[in-house]
Swiss-Prot record:
GO molecular function: interleukin-17 receptor activity
GO cellular component term of the entry, any: extracellular region
Name of the protein in question: Interleukin-17 receptor E-like protein
Entry keyword set: Secreted, Signal
InterPro entries per the UniProt record, alphabetical: IL-17_rcpt-like, IL-17_rcpt_C/E_N
Cell compartments where the protein resides: Secreted
Taxonomic path: Eukaryota, Metazoa, Chordata, Craniata, Vertebrata
Protein's gene: IL17REL
Keyword presence, Hydrolase: no
Signal peptide segment: 1-21
């Protein structure tokens, strides 16, 4: 008993394995159940697109079953062609004249239909009997998405069967080694960075159709990045040079056969190239008229972008509040301060990058200085700007690991330029601060521009050199007095004794 079950299981497994293989056929025509007379029409009857009321005597299940499968028809010199086989099972009815099967490509909306008519004597005399119909084959392509429908003739409302069918792709072993589209899709390429071109080698099977190659930018669709090149079947060389202007992660090589609804093969040579990724963050532009900073990536990018500022060289970039944006297409920041410390930070699935567009270019900028004020007991904060601007000052408590805690906000008073001509001399603004507050231990002064949406601060700390008194208890520098005898001999002897040249020595 166990042996019989094992044999039955093995037989079932082997039958299932064989059913996974794509059958090869030599002929594919119409056939009906024995005893029924059928004839076929390839042209679609447009009037069958409109339905009519179903007779009361006709059941909705008059269409019993619809099955679709893929087959291959092979010619030794030309390879194999992909075909779709459709089978239907119906119950005959006196009002039913025939069947219509259609296969529509979901990619191109192209539709193929076949009609099968049953002789009048058959549906009158054999009403209620089951009829099996094998339609003629539909020509399909590798990896094609199809929508298959079955209707009655005439088309009765609510009486229809449909299903989706996916044609096997080149990854299926039998298809990959037998179909010309798959053979031609095995492209070999070399990137010539010096000549900025991609050399493509197209392997050809005997009798295969012409082949197209192009470069495209893979966005929602693959957009042309150059004119397509046609490789003819009888061309002497199957090698093609495709020039490109810029290495980008979304720059792809696309190839397809010169046949309707052919499968397109895409290869993206720079997809994981570090240098190509760096190019994406360099398309930052500043528009002086509107003071707008914009960035538009050449390739689709998923992530966030924000403005940040660097307090000094090598420091981390601190994010500006309310500046984060999701990256969809183009990113814009209006009314941006053109300070060298202002940067853009890009955070994506590939990693993070920082670009400071004003760092190495000459843009309108401003500067803040602190010096003793003519008013007794005060320090004067002065702003110099190459264009009219408004500023404010913060008194901040300096911290070691965090941003300074800024409390007071003071507005600077603008002054016209000395000559009255802003183009000839910079504009000025100033603010006098009480010396006791500004010179307190751990206090920094931050200056901001207030007439723009996004600005970075300038910060000055340790203000003793700006008019604040020195700390009490600090020893004065000692100076070793220079001996009365001067000359190179005495200086050499003094150096050997460790005295130096009489310079100031800090404790």
């Amino acid at each position: 008993m166990l042996a019989g079950q094992a044999l039955a299981f093995l037989g079932l497994t082997w039958g299932t394995f064989q059913s996974l293989a794509i059958p090869r056929i030599t002929e594919c025509g119409l056939s009906c159940s024995q005893g029924f007379a059928c004839r076929s029409h390839r042209n679609r009857n447009i009037f069958n697109s409109f339905c009519r009321p179903r007779p009361v005597s006709m059941s909705r299940s008059v269409l019993e079953a619809l099955t679709s499968s893929t087959a291959m028809q092979c010619v030794p010199s030309d390879g194999c062609a992909m075909l779709l086989r459709v089978r239907a099972s119906i119950t005959l009815h006196e009002r039913l004249r025939g069947l219509e099967a259609c296969a529509m490509s979901l990619d191109t909306q192209e539709t193929q239909c076949q009609s099968v008519w049953v002789a009048r004597a058959s549906h009158r005399q054999q009403g209620g009997q089951q009829l099996q119909v094998h339609f003629g084959c539909f020509a399909v392509s590798v990896a094609q998405h199809l929508y298959v429908t079955l209707r009655t003739i005439p088309h009765f409302c609510g009486v229809q069967l449909d299903q989706r069918h996916l044609v096997e792709d080149c990854g299926e072993e039998d298809v990959g080694r037998s179909v010309p589209d798959c053979l031609a899709g095995k492209l070999s390429y070399w990137v010539d960075r010096r000549r900025k071109a991609i050399l493509v080698q197209v392997p050809r099977a005997s009798g295969s159709p012409d082949y197209y190659l192009r470069l495209c930018l893979k966005r929602f669709t693959c957009e042309d990045a150059g004119a397509p090149v046609r490789v003819t079947a009888n061309s002497v060389s199957q090698a093609v040079f495709l020039p490109y202007s810029q290495e980008l992660p979304c720059l792809c090589l696309e190839g397809w056969s010169a046949t309707p609804d052919a499968v397109r093969i895409q290869i993206c040579p720079f997809e994981n190239d570090t240098e190509a990724l760096e190019v994406l963050w360099d398309t930052v532009y500043y528009h002086p008229e509107s003071q707008t900073l914009s960035w538009e990536p050449a390739c689709p990018v998923s992530g966030h972008v924000s403005l940040c500022w660097r307090p000094g060289p090598g420091a981390g970039c601190r994010k500006l509040q309310q500046s984060s944006q999701l990256v969809h297409r183009r990113v814009q920041y209006p009314l941006v301060d053109t300070q060298p410390q202002l940067c853009l930070k890009f955070s994506t699935s590939w990693g993070s990058w920082v670009r400071c567009p004003f760092e190495q270019r000459r843009f309108p900028t401003w500067k803040m200085t602190i010096q003793p004020s003519p008013t007794k007991g005060h320090l004067r904060v002065t702003f110099f700007s190459s264009s009219p601007a408004h500023f404010q000052v913060h008194l901040c408590h300096r911290r070691k690991s965090q941003l300074p805690a800024c409390q007071r906000t003071l507005q600077a008073s603008p002054l016209p330029s000395a000559s009255g001509d802003l183009a000839a001399a910079p504009a000025f603004a100033f603010l006098d601060l009480p010396r006791e507050e500004a010179c307190a231990p751990g206090i920094c002064i931050q200056g901001w521009r207030t007439d723009v949406h996004f600005s970075v601060p300038q910060q000055l700390c340790n203000l003793r050199s700006s008019g604040c008194p020195s700390l009490r208890g600090r020893r004065r520098p000692r100076t070793r007095p220079r001996p009365p005898t001067a000359g190179w001999a005495w200086r050499a002897l003094n150096r050997r004794l460790g005295g130096g040249n009489g310079e100031t020595i800090r404790p």
